[in-house]
C-alpha cells in the first residue's frame, strides 16, 4: 500500500503548511494493457520514500524511489513528425569527439511548479526491462535491460536537472533502414549512458 502520514496546518489560511511522509513498498505504480491509444503499457513496481514539508507555496520534497527488477514497460512513439528516413534523428545522435565546432544549445520552454523544491534519487534495478516502440505496430523498437542511479532536481526557479549513469546489461534495436530490410543491432553488456546536468 501507499501510505501518507503527517500534518496539514490550516491555522493560518494564508500560509497553509504541510509536514508529510510518504512510503510504499513493492507498489504497482503502473499496470496498463497494450491498446491502440496507449503511449505507455506494461507494469512498473517501485519502493518509494519521501517527505513533503513547508508552506504550500514553497514546498520542499526530498526522497528516493527504487524501480524494482520485475518492471517491464514499453513507451510508444505516436504522432511523431519523423519520417522513415530520419526516424532515429531525435533518438540517437552520433558524435565525433574530434569535431571542435560548437553547436548552439536549443532553447527549452520551462514549466514552473510554483516555487517547489524537489530533490529525488532514483535507483533502477539491473533486471528492469524497458522498450521503446519506434512505430505504433512495434516492428521497429529498442529493447533495453539495465539499471543505474539517477538524481532528479527541480529548483524553485523552474529548472529540471537529471544526473547519473544508466548501465546496460543487454538489449537490441530493430530498425528498418530505407532500401535495407529490417536490421537487428545488439547492445553490448557494459554499455552505458552518462547524464550530467541534463536540463529536462
Model regions and ranges:
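Strand-loop-strand
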Residues: 1-198
